[in-house]
């Protein structure tokens, strides 16, 4: 009998899922990759690929029951999450838990948990279910405010609003970017923060919680552009962030890696969001740590030891984005991007492109953050996404 689960099913097969699949296969696991479109990145390295509408509960239940995996690892947010609870009741392990997946895919549920039940410090916020209600709740928060759909991903539908006249446009953007049938937004005070960080938090099956060195990152339109590790925090800030991350992940339960996001404002640490899975800003750990966030996730999921997490003095990442729509893709400039030492380029293998779609990432190590970020930026700037051949 195997000493740990051997069949892993990924619900979502993007670039993060691809790295999870690679980490799983290096541990001898069989990987089944599921997504809504064929040829998704993780499918390219999986043992089995399944294409299905991921928000269709019946389709999701059918594919899981047919394969009977040892563990199901959700890797995206656009899922029929209520089906996961049904699978858990049937004895299938959902990572970290079905409840954690459901709570964190809804900004209102995770915010109510963090601010209300767990009493974590967050930005002041309110909810609105119409353009008229949005105007009523935004004014007391003061300008500017941030408007987001309660259900969306990768910054879709988010906007910063400077005055009441711009709220109707923000409402329309939120509805256009919302996932599923949600018609509610969360509106938050705009925080003039010093730094935005991700604290990768690992819950092990033995009950122990581990932390990676904090990762600083910059976003544009709610989508990650670059990250670096370690981010510079005071001892007090780090202690606050770790305490809050442990509080919320203990409540969500299960085993695995969580990406817990915080704002740093002066000396205050403010909870932002949480993903119960490897985080895009954590791609930097592929070059910065002895164990990447993907390897850590798999070790925690499978109940394997994590003796130590060590990191380089400084490492950084910069995304590689598409500029136009393309039915097939290729890349130019990779050879120039790889001329510097301690630099890597990852091209995700997405079959098509659209403006702003993340197609790859450049990673670099340096003696300090400035050097590492400059190297990653130079490498990313070398790479262009171009139309590929459509020949079969």
Curated annotation (Swiss-Prot):
The keyword Thylakoid does not apply. N(1)-(5-phospho-beta-D-ribosyl)glycinamide binds at residues 15-16, 75, 280, 350, 357-358. It is an enzyme of class 6 (ligase). Keywords: ATP-binding, Ligase, Magnesium, Metal-binding, Nucleotide-binding, Purine biosynthesis. Pathway: Purine metabolism; IMP biosynthesis via de novo pathway; N(2)-formyl-N(1)-(5-phospho-D-ribosyl)glycinamide from N(1)-(5-phospho-D-ribosyl)glycinamide (formate route): step 1/1. GO terms for molecular function: ATP binding; magnesium ion binding; phosphoribosylglycinamide formyltransferase 2 activity; phosphoribosylglycinamide formyltransferase activity. ATP binds at residues 107, 148, 153-158, 188-191, 196. It catalyses: N(1)-(5-phospho-beta-D-ribosyl)glycinamide + formate + ATP = N(2)-formyl-N(1)-(5-phospho-beta-D-ribosyl)glycinamide + ADP + phosphate + H(+). Transmembrane segments: none annotated. Pfam families: ATP-grasp, PurT_C, RS_preATP-grasp-like. One of its GO terms (cellular component) is cytosol. Mg(2+) binds at residues 261, 273. The keyword Ion transport does not apply. One of its GO terms (biological process) is 'de novo' IMP biosynthetic process. InterPro entries: ATP-grasp (IPR011761), ATP-grasp_carboxylate-amine (IPR003135), ATP_grasp_subdomain_1 (IPR013815), PreATP-grasp_dom_sf (IPR016185), PurT (IPR005862), PurT/PurK_preATP-grasp (IPR054350), PurT_C (IPR048740), Rudment_hybrid_motif (IPR011054). Residues 112-302 form the ATP-grasp domain. Its EC number is 6.3.1.21. It comes from the Bacteria. Homodimer. Involved in the de novo purine biosynthesis. Catalyzes the transfer of formate to 5-phospho-ribosyl-glycinamide (GAR), producing 5-phospho-ribosyl-N-formylglycinamide (FGAR). Formate is provided by PurU via hydrolysis of 10-formyl-tetrahydrofolate. Belongs to the PurK/PurT family. This is Formate-dependent phosphoribosylglycinamide formyltransferase. It comes from Synechococcus sp. (strain CC9605).
């Amino acid at each position: 009998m195997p000493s740990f689960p051997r069949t892993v099913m990924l619900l979502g097969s993007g670039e993060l899922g691809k790295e999870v699949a690679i980490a799983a296969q290096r541990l001898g696991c069989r990987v089944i990759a599921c997504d809504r479109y064929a040829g998704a990145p993780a499918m390219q390295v999986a043992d089995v690929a399944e294409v299905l509408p991921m928000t269709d509960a019946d389709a999701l239940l059918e594919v899981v029951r047919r394969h009977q995996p040892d563990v199901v690892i959700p890797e995206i947010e656009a899922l029929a999450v209520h089906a996961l609870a049904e699978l858990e009741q049937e004895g299938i392990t959902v990572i970290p838990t079905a409840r954690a997946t459901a709570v964190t895919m809804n900004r209102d549920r995770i915010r109510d948990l963090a601010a209300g039940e767990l009493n974590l410090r967050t930005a002041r916020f309110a909810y609105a279910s119409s353009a008229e209600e949005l105007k009523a709740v935004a004014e007391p928060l003061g300008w500017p405010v941030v408007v987001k759909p309660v259900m969306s991903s990768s910054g879709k539908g988010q906007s910063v609003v400077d005055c009441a006249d711009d709220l109707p446009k923000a409402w329309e953007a939120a509805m256009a970017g919302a996932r599923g049938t949600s018609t509610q937004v969360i509106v938050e005070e705009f925080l003039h923060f010093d730094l935005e960080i991700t604290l990768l938090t690992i819950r092990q099956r033995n009950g122990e919680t581990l932390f990676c060195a904090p990762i600083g990152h910059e976003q544009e339109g709610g989508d990650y552009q670059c990250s670096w590790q370690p981010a510079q925090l005071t001892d007090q800030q780090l202690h606050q962030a770790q305490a809050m991350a442990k509080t919320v992940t203990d409540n969500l339960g299960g085993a695995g890696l969580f990406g817990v996001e915080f704002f740093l404002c002066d000396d205050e640490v403010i909870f932002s969001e949480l993903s119960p899975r490897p985080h895009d800003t954590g791609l930097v750990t592929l070059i910065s740590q002895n164990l990447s966030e993907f390897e850590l996730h798999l070790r925690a999921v499978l109940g394997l030891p994590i003796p130590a997490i060590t990191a380089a003095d400084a490492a950084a990442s910069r995304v590689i984005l598409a500029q136009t729509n393309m039915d097939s893709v290729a890349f130019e400039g990779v050879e120039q991007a790889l001329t510097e030492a301690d630099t890597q380029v990852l091209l995700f293998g997405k079959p098509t492109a659209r403006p702003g779609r993340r197609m790859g990432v450049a990673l670099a190590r340096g003696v300090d953050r400035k050097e590492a970020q400059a190297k990653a930026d130079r490498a990313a700037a070398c790479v262009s996404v171009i139309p590929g051949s459509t020949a079969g």
